[in-house]
């Protein structure tokens, strides 16, 4: 059991060591490359890839007609954030 805990700790530390930081909610690093259908985003000071559409929007409910979406295996809904429809789950 201790081997599993040690392995999990090593994976977490490895991820934090090579994580790309962001400032003021903006991820400008070229080190993070997101797959098609994803855009760079900043969460808790780290750059992440967020599921997004190419559809622009102006208010939160502009994206609700897109229906449900999936992010990291969890179902969510589209919301307008930073003028782009992004997938969020709550």
Swiss-Prot record:
Location within or outside the cell: Secreted
Keywords: Antimicrobial, Disulfide bond, Protease inhibitor, Secreted, Serine protease inhibitor, Signal
Signal sequence bounds: 1-19
Spans through the membrane: none
GO molecular function: serine-type endopeptidase inhibitor activity
Modification after translation: Contains 6 disulfide bonds.
Tissue-by-tissue expression: Detected in hemolymph (at protein level). In oysters collected in the summer the expression level is highest in the digestive gland with low levels of expression in gill, mantle, labial palp, style-sac midgut, gonad, heart, and hemocyte. In winter expression levels are higher in all tissues with highest expression levels observed in the digestive gland. Within the digestive gland expression is limited to the basophil cells of the digestive diverticula.
GO cellular component: extracellular space
Lineage: superkingdom: Eukaryota
Biological role: Slow-binding inhibitor of serine proteases. The inhibitor rapidly binds to the protease forming a weak enzyme-inhibitor complex, and this is followed by a slow isomerization forming a tight-binding enzyme-inhibitor complex. Active against subtilisin A, perkinsin and trypsin with dissociation constants of 0.29 nM, 13.7 nM and 17.7 nM respectively. Not active against thermolysin, papain or pepsin. Has antiparasitic activity against the protozoan P.marinus.
Descriptive protein name: Serine protease inhibitor Cvsi-1
Organism: Crassostrea virginica (Eastern oyster)
Source organism phylogeny: Eukaryota, Metazoa, Spiralia, Lophotrochozoa, Mollusca
């Amino acid at each position: 059991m201790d081997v599993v805990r040690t392995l999990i700790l090593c994976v977490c530390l490895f991820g934090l060591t090579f994580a790309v930081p962001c400032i003021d909610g903006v991820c400008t690093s070229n080190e993070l490359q997101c797959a098609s259908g994803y855009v760079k985003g900043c969460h808790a000071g780290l750059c992440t890839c967020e599921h997004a559409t190419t559809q622009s929007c102006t208010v939160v409910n502009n994206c609700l007609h897109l229906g449900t979406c999936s992010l990291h295996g969890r179902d969510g809904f589209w919301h307008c954030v930073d003028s782009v429809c992004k997938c969020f789950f709550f």
